[in-house]
Amino acid sequence: MLPELRDLFVRDLEKLTLELEAYPDEASVWAVPDGVLNSGGTLALHLIGNLSQFVGADLGGVDFVRDRPAEFARRDVPRAELIAGVRDVSALVAGTLDRLDPAALDAPHPTQLPGFPEGMTTRFFLIHLYGHLNWHLGQVNYHRRLL
């Protein structure tokens, strides 16, 4: 299951990179039209923080301190910086999953979060994180086409 999850995360983070590259200009990455809560740039920052924390730090032991409020507050980060961040987190996720002992999938995830089952396994949470990535990837795609 780990190789499949790794490949899916890498594939869809590459799709996120392609979406960011497809915006017509820098300003549109950060545009928030009426009825839309988050820009494509905000969603990219959020996914970078989310995966850096829950995969890179929690499972891979990478030194990372997440600033979730900043993920939603920062604006006008250059598109090249966003793309570099997505590529970095893709490599981080791939490397972490490559090194993860398959037995860890059935162990409780190191971070237990409110609203999730008590004793949530790493397998459960990785599947959740992949769904979360895809939810926001779809939002970025819609946001880009809406503009």
Language-model-detected regions and their locations in the chain:
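Short, contiguous alpha-helical
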Residues: 6-10, 14, 26-70, 111-147
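Acidic/histidine-rich alpha-helical segments that form the ligand environment
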Residues: 74-110, 124-133
